[in-house]
Amino acid sequence: MNGDEDWLTVGKVVAAQGMQGELRINPSSDFPERFTLPGQRWLKERNGEPRPIELLTGRQLPGRSLYVVKFAGVNNRNAAEALVGQKLLVPSSDRPSLAEGEFHLLDLVGLEARLQAEGPAIGHVIDLTTAGNDLLEIELLTGRRVLVPFVEAIVPEVQLNQGWLRLTPPPGLLEL
């Protein structure tokens, strides 16, 4: 597995936690088991190659979207801090199967954003933020970036095969 298409980014190491080598992970996956079930994962620096690492334990922080994980061989705060900023990966083949009409949130990145199904693009989805509600970061054709809540009332239609999604934003949302 060499190309980026062989890997799924499921989170990012955002901080060290405590003195025993635990790490805080900001998830980009809707599947908690990616952070809680022991087993092999991979870490990747910005321009580096993925390298295997063993997940020993993981738990979600109460009331937060962050996870705290413990990897084999990361036994102190200095070792943990050296991993901050790296992406947590799994092989693309580990992608869970979905029911009809469902999709993986990461598949939304790159889609055109439209106001009407047959209308022109107003921008593209460039990123996804997992918070209380998932937020799509859309870069408008003007170059400005806006955050759009990924809820059915605002994003009522997603056409993955055709490469677009439709927005029905409340007044002012795209002007923020």
From Swiss-Prot:
Annotated TM spans: none
Protein family per UniProt: Belongs to the RimM family.
Domain named PRC barrel: residues: 100-173
GO cellular component: cytoplasm; ribosome
Gene3D superfamilies in the cross-refs: PRC-barrel domain (2.30.30.240), RimM (2.40.30.60)
Any Pfam family: RimM
Entry protein name: Ribosome maturation factor RimM
Subunit structure: Binds ribosomal protein uS19.
Name of the gene this protein is made from: rimM
An individual GO BP term: rRNA processing
InterPro entries for this protein: PRC_barrel-like_sf, PRC_RimM, RimM, RimM_N, RimM_N_sf, Transl_B-barrel_sf
Major location category of this protein: cytoplasm
Species of the source: Prochlorococcus marinus (strain MIT 9313)
Superkingdom as given in the UniProt entry: Bacteria
Gene Ontology molecular function: any one: ribosome binding
Signal peptide start-end: none
Role according to the record: An accessory protein needed during the final step in the assembly of 30S ribosomal subunit, possibly for assembly of the head region. Essential for efficient processing of 16S rRNA. May be needed both before and after RbfA during the maturation of 16S rRNA. It has affinity for free ribosomal 30S subunits but not for 70S ribosomes.
Domain notes: The PRC barrel domain binds ribosomal protein uS19.
Record's keyword annotation contains Glycoprotein: no
Subcellular location: Cytoplasm
Keywords, ordered alphabetically: Chaperone, Cytoplasm, Ribosome biogenesis, rRNA processing
